[in-house]
Regions:
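Bacterial N-terminal signal peptides that target proteins for export
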Residues: 1-9
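C-terminal region of N-terminal signal peptides and the immediate post-cleavage residues
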Residues: 16-31
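Beta-strand-enriched cores of mature, soluble protein domains
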Residues: 28-160
């Protein structure tokens, strides 16, 4: 049961960081590519169907907060934002994630499905506010470390 919760937490942490550690698109036809590190700060599993602790079941939700950091692939840099999200269990092996990232120049919104056992996932950027008002694109999320790790790298690709 705890292994499944750790897997869910790792997937959600990855999603959160990914979707949201982004900067505004640049002028021209080239996408903006940003790499960040997402570190899970906390989370709670909500037993929506009151099944009594048998682990996550269909409809249960995992609510979380992640810190977002500059990252060059080796060393964590300064904190640049926070992601708040919800992952709803849709099957024994998947969840649907939605989240909002708070960055200095605005907010980003993202969503997508995650498989608990996948090491790499993709999620879409739906839009944002402020500097990110017309944001759209895709994020590639890669879990770092073992199954109990709370860290994920991600590459955000915003289309012009």
């Amino acid at each position: 049961m705890m292994r499944r919760i750790y897997l869910l937490a790792a997937v959600v942490a990855a999603a959160a960081g990914l979707v949201f550690g982004v900067s505004a698109g640049s002028a021209g036809d080239q996408p903006t590519v940003i790499s960040l590190l997402s570190v899970q700060q906390g989370g709670s599993l909500i037993d929506v169907d009151r099944s009594g602790g048998r682990g996550p079941t269909l409809g249960d939700e995992f609510i979380f907060t992640d810190g977002l950091y500059q990252w060059d692939g080796k060393k964590r840099g300064k904190r640049v934002g926070t992601t708040h999200g919800i992952a709803t269990i849709t099957s024994p092996t998947t969840a649907f994630f939605t989240g909002t990232t708070v960055l200095p120049d605005g907010l980003l919104q993202g969503a997508g499905y995650f498989r608990f056992t996948a090491r790499v996932e993709k999620i879409i950027v739906l839009g944002g506010t402020g500097r990110y008002g017309n944001a759209g694109g895709e994020v590639t999320i890669t879990k770092l470390g073992g199954e109990n790790s709370n860290r994920s790298s991600f590459v955000v690709r915003l289309v012009p």
